[in-house]
Amino acid sequence: MAAKRKTAAKRTVQKAAKKIADPSRWKFGITFPIVLILILFAAAFVYGGYLESGTEEDEPPQVVSNFIKKDADLAVHYIDVGQGDSSLIVYKDKSILIDAGERDSGSTVVEYLQSLGIEKLDYVIATHPHSDHIGGLPDVINSFEIGTVIAPRISDEMTPTTKTYERFLTALSGKGLRLTAANAGDTYSIADPDIESDNTEFEILAPVKNDYDDLNNWSVVLKLVHGGTSFIFTGDAEQSAENDILDSGADGSADVLKVGHHGSSTSTSKAFLKAVSPSIAVIQCGTDNSYGHPHAETIEKLDSSNVKIYRNDYDGTVIIYSDGKDIRAVTEKGDAKQNVDN
């Protein structure tokens, strides 16, 4: 009976997905504790220094709640949602959200975005259908104007039957949104059309294949480029998916690496880390989480490569700014032990 119920549930979800699909282009026909008082923000957040050749600014930047630069060129926010992932990219009038943590983190992400004055998300990227990545997305989808929603096109046999995934599909359907397949090699420009030299864009690096037997390896991996700086976001991609990226010939080098799978030893292989060659690594994990993330093996590999490590469990939310030449890090807990030179 249990097997029959599971099969029926899978058929229900698959039927719902196919019912809202555009088969020609694979688009589904559907359509932090950060919620702290501003005084706490002002007290808790401090600026890190420029990496490489950056210099101090002559005048203090315009800020929101005393730590978020309102007039920043490009900002990447690694939002503290506990044991989950949520990253926000803000560039001029464009905003991109990658995941939104567990279901109970949805309101956290919504209020964080609202504190920045965001009304529209030009892109929402659901890296893969695990609850600690897409659980909070329905709240986000229901709270903002949404442009393009990108997710992996998962095979029928791997289609999840969870309530979390059903809530995600329902939220999309309720807003009349369409889900666009993440295809390796696709690029999306967010450049300022008035600046001829602006190269700001993100490229989908993975999933490379369509036959993974672990949802983590279906994760959307993307590379964001702004001027001479770059960022990679890996979802929960594990070493199998990392190897496929390397074999694809894609340029995986980046200044900042969002470490895969919350710092699990199943991700961030030595070969992948060498190819990315980041100056900074950000690990999105919860305090004293039951998985033991990040694993010691991952930290050792990052340390031995002289990579500066930021962690949500130690540093709270991490924001990295780029002016196209240099990057600057801001953390919620500037006195955290992980905020010293590695």
Where are these regions (language model features)?
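Non-globular, low-confidence helical/coil segments that flank catalytic cores
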Residues: 2-342
